[in-house]
Regions:
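Enzymes that bind and transform nitrogen-containing heteroaromatic metabolites
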Residues: 1-176
Length: 176
């Protein structure tokens, strides 16, 4: 009797974004979102405990180097050719490496930003879901949520939850 082979698993890519009401994810480069609510931080930490790897951009990595060294971390940067590993951190140029193949050994990958990273994964049809925490703040300046996207992406709302009395919202979208 022939043994049935399991179909290969598909890696699930989930983006996590903390944003102001005007869609800003940071006031300046390399600053962690220390302006988010404790409820968002709790949700974020709980979510990260369930993933196998994280994908970040260079500035996000610089802002959170110590915390990211403890995980399987992939840092996207167009400043290098190919791929370079340093412990549990892999630095990779997304235009010279097949990201889907590189990350295929993982079941669940958290995409933590910044704006160019979100667009890179959207452009490669890798994102499956996006969680956006909207904090009740207006910055009026700063880094945008999505930078360099070259096409329109349709989303469908999976859930919406109010996290606190201040009005912090957690939006959960699926990618269509």
């Amino acid at each position: 009797m022939k043994e049935k082979r399991k179909p290969p698993h598909k890696t699930r890519f989930v983006a996590f974004v903390a944003a102001s009401v005007d869609g800003r994810i940071s006031l300046t480069k390399r600053t962690p979102p220390d302006w988010t609510s404790k409820e968002d931080w709790r949700f974020f930490q709980n979510s990260l405990s369930k993933v196998d790897a994280v994908v970040v951009g260079w500035n996000t990595y610089q802002a959170a180097t110590v915390r990211l060294r403890k995980r399987n971390t992939f840092v996207l940067s167009d400043r290098l050719n190919g791929l370079r590993r340093r412990g549990s951190v892999t630095f990779v140029n997304p235009s010279s490496v097949d990201l889907a193949k590189l990350l295929s050994e993982y079941k669940s990958v958290a995409v933590l930003g910044g704006g160019m990273v979100y667009c890179t994964l959207l452009g490669n049809n890798l994102l499956d879901e996006i969680y956006i925490t909207v904090e009740p703040l207006i910055f009026g300046r700063g880094k945008e949520m999505f930078v360099g996207c070259t096409r329109t992406t349709r989303l469908h709302l999976l859930s919406m939850r109010r996290l606190n009395r201040s009005g912090t919202l957690l939006l959960h979208y699926g990618i269509i």
